From Swiss-Prot:
Pfam families: Intron_maturas2 (PF01348), MatK_N (PF01824). This is Maturase K. Usually encoded in the trnK tRNA gene intron. Probably assists in splicing its own and other chloroplast group II introns. One of its GO terms (cellular component) is chloroplast. Belongs to the intron maturase 2 family. MatK subfamily. One of its GO terms (biological process) is tRNA processing. It is found in: Plastid, Chloroplast. It comes from the Eukaryota. GO terms for molecular function: RNA binding. It comes from Iris sanguinea. Keywords: Chloroplast, mRNA processing, Plastid, RNA-binding, tRNA processing.
Amino acid sequence: MEXLQGYLEKGRSRQQPLLYPLLFQEYIYALAHDRGLKGSLFYEPTEVFGYDSXSRLALVKRLIIXIYQQNFFLFGVNDSNKNRFVSHHHNNFCYSHFYSQVISQGFAILVEIPFSLRLXSYFEKKEIPXSHNLRSIHSIFPFLEDKLLHLNYVSDILIPHPIHMEILVQILQCWIQDVPLLHFLRFFLHKYHNWNSFLITPKKSIYVFSKENKRLFRFLYNSYVSECEFLLVFLRKQSSYLRLTSFGFFLERRHFYVKIERLRMQHLILIVVCRDFFQGTLWSFKDPFMXXXXXXXXXVLASXGTHLLXKKWXYNXXNLWQYYFHFWYQSYRIHMNQLSXYSFYFLGYLSSLLKNSSTVRNQMLENSFLIDTVTNKFETLVPVIFLIGSLSKAQFCTVSGHPISKPIWADLSDSEIIERFGRMCRNLSHYHSGSSKKQGLYRIKYILRLSCARTSAXTHXSTVRTFXRRLGSGLLEEFFTEEEQVLSLILPKTIPFTFYGSHKERIWYLDIIRINDLVNHS
């Protein structure tokens, strides 16, 4: 455990500048409200309850003046109508949701400053070119295909959640040594929990906080996942003869490239890389090769070797998490399976290894003999059952996959209905373009196409057949033409391509920075 503490201390570069005084500067809140931060890596426009610019500025000034007062304090009041901030020093109040959002946005800007400076200095020091292709979620699957072909076992681990907010503050304290800022953050989180305690259950408090304070919670949650990842990296380095220089580089990219731009909080992505991506240098290990990937609250550990060695990795990771975060980690959250007979759900795909056997006849002089060879193939499939469940929740079909009309869209025009359904189909095709087999994707698109026809027919109080006859082939063009044109440009001209056929060409795009909404619901 002493080696773990030493590794964590060495991996963190403690930030010394004081950030708390910046909390009283108006420009910090201006930056949080889409004024001058568009070029920032962390840019994300925010809106607060429909207040105009003048009203927001006046309330922010009032908040700053109130914080300046020595005897000023805030606490929640259980009001029968509205939950409000109350200032006893000024005897005035503002809505708690506005102030909580303003403070959380100010905190988010402040805590991001040292990390953004650290990222820029790290790239300059290492002379690493910015590769924006690593932002794409699809860039993960070629990595998995390259690594998993040589591994034996895979373990599904559920990263412990929800995490207590005090642990989030303690994690941030390891990176930022501004005591006043951390005390104020702890005070803010504690009061926010009290404000909502009479409205929601404790289990839902973090969820509500994450919905109303997305930027701050995303940063705190990413910090927590970062600590979990450091433990995995620590385990990996303990089994290596040589130090792995690629770890620090890729984790930096994951912190700031992959997860910040328009990625939802719960869809965090990690790949622990056991080789240098850009130099192509391979390393040797004392233990069999291990690769790890994590998304949302699930982590996947894959390893070569025996079942006992694979269980050792999972056991060590669980023990380190328990020791470091001070919680009990249930053993049932870890599942060990053999890759050749197991499909794991990861980022909207069902991934597995297929063994293809082939027999080759070898002729040597007058003797001939047969050679049986077995090769592994990494297969990614569309999770049809999961997607049908998502469509059922969204009221596009029944639980069994029977298409139904979308009643909430009944007031839209035909063009708007077709455009929405067509956009859903195009997004699905774009996201699941890496599927080994497209039959499942065609089934999902058929459900959406028929649901579109029934929704439009219901608005005209007619039948689907009448609506389809009146519309003609326009419905099919809206759903399929764009995808067919894109694939015809990508695939070689020598490859015969029929859209309605069962082609097996896998295409990974480098512009996908968020998980499809239907995949989220599943």
